[in-house]
Every structure is written in structure tokens, then in C-alpha cells.
């Protein structure tokens, strides 16, 4: 049975890679013909992501959309379980959203090209001098009315436990005066584990949208660590509710 799953997963992985290359090529062509970044992001949300989730055997369930005023920009903060998280979030969030990605992603063919063409931001780990510049870029993106999503744990969870949220990048939301939306992901780590495609299995992924956290109260900024702790607690509460 394990051999059969390995063969199946290898075939699906190859098909998903071809699907990804095709959609990215189409998005890059659209950008070259004058389409905006948001158009290319919607292509991912409405075309690429549903195909990836279907190929992986994912049944996506989204809860809490009614809690958010989608006419406003937000910083979305989510727990991180799997590389398929991005596809789930692209599909779940009803607005174009950019991601804060590892700097290594910029060098990956197709993925890096698409990320640059759609205004994604890149973080250089352990590079202290890049932090202030990244926060300014993120704040400018949010202030311009665009949504941004990041994984404040800093890396994917190996155990399924949600690590404490790092607060540094949340300063961008404070500077831009936009709210932070906690997002809970459940099931992605079982569909596509950190260990690789050999352990991949079809299954459900649940996405929960939390209540927006205002970054300013009576004109005064809320401390970013307090925001990180509250977002972390809200994500944990949604996950416990589903347990």
C-alpha cells in the first residue's frame, strides 16, 4: 500500500508542478500585456489554487468570513503547517493577497518570477539590517490598500503545535494603521506533511477567519507583542474549537 501511495503522490506532484507552471506562465503573460498585480493574484485564487487543492484531494472549508469588512486592507497572520497553506489561503480569502516569503523563494523558477511580478515581499532570515526596510515596504503595501499575509511562527510546524508568534513584522500594520486578522489552519499538515510528498494523503483543510484586531486604540498604537500574543491566542482558540 505504501508503494502505491508513493507512486500516486509522485504522479500528482508532477501534475501539480505542470499545473503551477502553466498558470504562472499565463499570469506572467497577462502582466506583460498590461494586467495589474491584483489580476494576476486573482488568477491564482480562482484558477491555480483550486486546481492544486483538487489535485491534492483537499476538501476546503472556510469559516468566519462574515467577521471581516472585506473593503478594508488587513495584515493576515496564520499558523504554518505545510507548503499547501498558501494555496488554501489564496482560495479561502476573498480578496487579492500578497505573502511574505523566504528570500530563497525569489530564486525558484516560476514561483520566484510570479512572486516578483505580483508584489510579494521577501524576508532574509537572520539579517538584522533587512528588518526595518522590510517593515517599511510592508507598511507601504498595507497603506496603499493591499492585503498582506504572513506566518509569524517563522517556519512550518513539525509537530502540529502552534509556536509563539514573532511580533516584528506586525509593526508594519501598526505603522500603516490597519487591523490584523488572525487565521487558523487545520489539516494542511496531514495532507502534505513537512517530511515531503511521500507522506501526502487526501483530506480536509479547515480555514478559520478571526475577528480583526485593531492596531490603534483612541489614536494610540497597541504594543506589537500584545497584538502577537492576542493573534496567537485567537488562532489557538479556533483550533481548540475544532478539536
Question: Could you describe each region identified by the protein language model?
Answer:
Residues 3, 132-243:
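Non-catalytic C-terminal accessory region of glycerolipid acyltransferases
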Residues 61-63, 121:
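General small-molecule cofactor/ligand-binding pocket signal
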Residues 1-61:
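N-terminal membrane-anchoring alpha-helices
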Residues 62, 76, 99-100, 207-209:
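Generic preference for hydrophobic
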Residues 20-41, 55, 70-128:
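Catalytic core of membrane glycerolipid acyltransferases/transacylases, capturing the structured
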Residues 65-69:
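Glycine-rich helix-loop-beta junction characteristic of Rossmann-like nucleotide cofactor-binding loops
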Residues 49, 120-124, 154-155:
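Short, basic, glycine/proline-bearing loop/turn elements
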Amino acid at each position: 500500500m505504501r508503494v502505491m501511495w508513493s507512486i500516486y503522490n509522485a504522479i500528482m506532484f508532477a501534475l501539480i508542478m505542470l499545473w503551477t507552471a502553466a498558470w504562472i506562465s499565463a499570469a506572467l503573460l497577462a502582466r506583460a500585456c498590461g494586467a495589474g498585480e491584483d489580476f494576476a493574484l486573482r488568477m491564482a485564487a480562482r484558477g491555480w489554487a483550486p486546481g492544486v487543492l483538487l489535485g491534492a484531494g483537499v476538501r476546503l472549508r472556510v469559516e468566519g468570513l462574515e467577521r471581516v469588512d472585506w473593503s478594508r486592507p488587513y495584515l493576515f497572520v496564520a499558523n504554518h503547517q505545510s507548503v499547501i497553506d498558501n494555496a488554501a489561503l489564496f482560495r479561502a480569502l476573498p480578496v487579492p493577497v500578497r505573502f511574505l516569503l523566504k528570500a530563497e523563494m525569489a530564486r525558484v523558477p516560476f514561483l520566484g518570477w510570479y512572486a516578483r511580478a505580483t508584489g510579494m515581499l521577501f524576508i532574509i532570515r537572520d539579517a538584522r539590517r533587512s528588518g526595518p526596510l522590510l517593515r517599511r515596504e510592508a507598511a507601504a503595501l498595507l497603506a496603499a490598500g493591499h492585503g498582506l499575509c504572513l506566518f509569524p511562527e517563522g517556519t512550518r510546524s513539525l509537530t502540529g503545535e502552534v509556536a509563539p508568534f514573532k511580533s516584528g513584522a506586525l509593526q508594519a500594520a501598526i505603522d500603516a494603521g490597519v487591523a490584523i486578522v488572525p487565521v487558523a489552519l487545520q489539516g494542511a499538515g496531514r495532507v502534505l506533511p513537512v517530511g515531503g510528498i511521500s507522506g501526502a494523503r487526501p483530506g480536509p483543510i479547515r480555514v478559520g477567519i478571526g475577528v480583526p484586531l485593531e492596531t490603534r486604540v483612541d489614536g494610540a498604537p497597541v504594543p506589537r507583542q500584545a497584538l502577537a500574543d492576542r493573534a496567537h491566542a485567537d488562532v489557538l482558540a479556533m483550533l481548540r474549537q475544532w478539536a
